[in-house]
């Protein structure tokens, strides 16, 4: 268990959200962030920078939508963090990722400080089995039927999907494992942490499971919120 932290302004615990941009549309998302803003929760909104080459049903809006981009810039002015969720919802080659990062900086006047890999994009960095080392990697391969041991190539210098050097340059924090416990810090007490076996990521962080309504509500139940406060913990909902 992480030793109790003295949080700023005498706060008893931390709660924030990393919002995965999958299936987002402007109308619904604006309502959610209006509520968060009224409650003074300055959370993280991830984005896709450009439209993908291959359309995917329900993939969600990207920063190429001018109305959406203008709204994101207003969010940023209010104190919300804009995160990176890969350049787009399709796999991106090295040059495409570099162009996406450059466009992100131009759009938001800053590097994307935080990111999460998107689903099954081949340029995902240290994703799938590559998140693990030693015996844990072997166990993961067995549990997944060796289906994901070679797919992700963002860290592989020989791959056209390699962008590890750009990740090191542009990104400070990359999301790794997700836990069912509301107290993310309790599940991963060393975050943000470094893994010297994975040199292209500066720092890793974990999060708590909330990828659908049922899991989100279960994780942030009143009972769990009370425990988070009692433990003086930190929750990063994903």
Which residues make up each language-model segment?
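Catalytic alpha-helical scaffold of carbohydrate-active enzymes acting on polysaccharides/glycoconjugates
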Residues: 1-205, 213-238
């Amino acid at each position: 268990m992480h030793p109790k932290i003295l949080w700023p302004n005498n706060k008893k615990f931390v709660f924030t959200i990393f919002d995965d941009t999958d299936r987002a549309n402007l109308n619904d998302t604006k309502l959610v962030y209006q509520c968060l803003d009224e409650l003074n929760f300055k959370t993280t909104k991830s984005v896709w920078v450009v439209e993908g080459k291959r359309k995917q049903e329900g993939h969600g809006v990207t920063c190429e939508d001018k109305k959406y981009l203008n709204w994101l810039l207003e969010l940023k002015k209010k104190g919300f963090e804009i995160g990176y969720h890969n350049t787009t919802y399709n796999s991106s080659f090295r040059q495409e990722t570099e162009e996406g990062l450059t466009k992100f900086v131009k759009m938001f006047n800053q590097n994307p400080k935080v990111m999460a890999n998107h689903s099954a994009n081949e340029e995902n960095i240290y994703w799938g089995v590559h998140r693990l080392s030693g015996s844990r990697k072997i166990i993961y391969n067995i549990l997944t039927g060796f289906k994901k041991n070679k797919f992700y190539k963002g860290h592989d210098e020989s791959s056209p999907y390699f962008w590890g050097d750009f990740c090191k340059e542009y990104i400070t924090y990359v999301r790794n494992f997700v836990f069912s416990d509301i107290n993310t810090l309790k599940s991963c007490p060393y975050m943000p942490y470094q893994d010297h076996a994975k040199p292209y990521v500066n720092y890793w962080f974990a999060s708590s499971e909330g990828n659908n309504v049922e899991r989100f509500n279960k994780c942030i139940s009143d009972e769990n919120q009370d425990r988070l406060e009692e433990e003086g913990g930190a929750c990063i909902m994903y």
